[in-house]
Structures are given as structure tokens and as C-alpha cells.
Swiss-Prot record:
Cross-referenced InterPro entries: Elong-fact-P_C, NA-bd_OB-fold, Rib_uL2_dom2, Transl_elong_fac_P/YeiP, Transl_elong_KOW-like, Transl_elong_P/YeiP_cen, Transl_elong_P/YeiP_CS, Transl_elongation_fac_P
A Gene Ontology cellular-component term: cytoplasm
UniProt-recorded name of the protein: Elongation factor P
Keyword tags: Cytoplasm, Elongation factor, Hydroxylation, Protein biosynthesis
Modification after translation, per record: May be beta-lysylated on the epsilon-amino group of Lys-34 by the combined action of EpmA and EpmB, and then hydroxylated on the C5 position of the same residue by EpmC (if this protein is present). Lysylation is critical for the stimulatory effect of EF-P on peptide-bond formation. The lysylation moiety may extend toward the peptidyltransferase center and stabilize the terminal 3-CCA end of the tRNA. Hydroxylation of the C5 position on Lys-34 may allow additional potential stabilizing hydrogen-bond interactions with the P-tRNA.
Its job: Involved in peptide bond synthesis. Alleviates ribosome stalling that occurs when 3 or more consecutive Pro residues or the sequence PPG is present in a protein, possibly by augmenting the peptidyl transferase activity of the ribosome. Modification of Lys-34 is required for alleviation.
Localization, UniProt: Cytoplasm
Organism of derivation: Vibrio parahaemolyticus serotype O3:K6 (strain RIMD 2210633)
Organism lineage string: Bacteria, Pseudomonadati, Pseudomonadota, Gammaproteobacteria, Vibrionales
Pathway of action: Protein biosynthesis; polypeptide chain elongation
Classification via Pfam families: EFP, EFP_N, Elong-fact-P_C
């Protein structure tokens, strides 16, 4: 297996720790006044989603995770699995609810998602950064009702609930940032 030195650690690098693929979220190189230098690393386990901090001595090596990120189009969900297709080979891959997780509310048919495969099985599904969804339910925005935050909750076509400005009405299509779950703007 390929190995990587702690000197080459950076955000996004995928490693094997305790026989489980992990991704580095943050890496901080620390050189104390006395003693050996080390890397303080924040890691997210790809299978369980747990975030933990580990320290590595400077110069140590770690095994690189044998994972593959591929872009696939979301097709549909049959209740148990979410089905994706490769546009070039037309090969279909089914991901379970554990791999999709909280991102299920951002999946829109025919949108391209990034799937992380480990041993040929999908372990994480990352939706596009921005999705366009129709508002299916929200309170009517009354004129002069601007006290407080100036926002209201809106239910989208996928079931996600997002805070939107008062002028958004049922049936409008809005753009949402899937990383934060925040309203970005109206789609014209």
C-alpha cells in the first residue's frame, strides 16, 4: 500500500486509521520550543462520520486510503437504496441510507453527486454545493410583518426545511447551499 509522510498532510487527504478510511479536515504543524515537532490533525471517519483529533510525530508515515471519488448522476430512491448512474459507462450504483445520511434532503433527480467508493462500495454521498428546489409550503408573507429576523421557515420539494426571506411564496424555485442548508437566492 502507498504511504504518506506527516510532512505531506493537508486537508482532504484520505488515510487508513484502525482499518477504516478517514479524511483529514484540518492539519496543524506544531514545533514546540523544547521537544520533537508534531502534527495535530482533525480527522473524520468516513464510515461512522465521527470526528476526532490525533497527533502524529513529525516524520511518521500513514497508509493512504484506497478510496475513489467519482461523479455520478442521482436517478431515484426506492425506499431502501438511492440509485446513481455513471454518464459515460451507464453503470448504476446503489447507495444505502447510511452512505447518504443527512444529504438525502438535497438529492434532486439528474443532479451530479460525488460518491466515495471503498472496496467498490459507496461509503459517502456528497451532493452538489448548490441545488435548486421548489418551495412546497411556507407561511404567507404579510406586508409590514418584518419584526424579528425577517425570515420564515419554508418546506422544499425534498422535505428539507430552510429559512427564507418573507417575500418567498409557495411554488417559487430557490437556490440553497447544501453545505450550510441556507437560502442563497431565487431562481429566475
Amino acid at each position: 500500500m502507498a504511504t504518506v509522510s506527516t510532512n505531506e498532510f493537508k486537508g482532504g487527504l484520505k488515510l487508513m486509521l484502525d482499518n477504516e478510511p478517514c479524511v483529514i479536515l484540518e492539519n496543524e504543524y506544531v514545533k514546540p520550543g523544547k521537544g520533537q515537532a508534531f502534527n495535530r490533525v482533525k480527522i473524520r471517519k468516513l464510515l461512522s462520520g465521527k470526528v476526532l483529533e490525533k497527533t502524529f510525530k513529525s516524520g511518521d508515515t500513514c497508509e493512504v486510503a484506497d478510496v475513489m471519488d467519482i461523479d455520478l448522476d442521482y436517478l431515484y430512491s426506492d425506499g431502501e437504496f438511492y440509485h446513481f448512474m455513471n454518464n459515460e459507462t451507464f453503470e448504476q450504483i446503489a447507495a444505502d441510507a447510511k452512505a447518504v445520511g443527512e444529504n438525502a434532503k438535497w438529492l434532486v433527480e439528474n443532479n451530479t453527486c460525488m460518491i466515495t467508493l471503498w472496496n467498490g462500495n459507496p461509503i459517502t454521498v456528497t451532493p452538489p454545493n448548490f441545488v435548486e428546489l421548489e418551495v412546497t409550503d411556507t407561511d404567507p408573507g404579510l406586508k409590514g410583518d418584518t419584526q424579528g429576523t425577517g425570515g420564515k421557515p419554508a418546506t422544499l420539494a425534498t422535505g428539507a426545511v430552510v429559512r427564507v426571506p418573507l417575500f418567498i411564496a409557495i411554488g417559487e424555485v430557490i437556490k440553497v447551499d447544501t453545505r450550510t442548508g441556507e437560502y442563497v437566492g431565487r431562481v429566475k
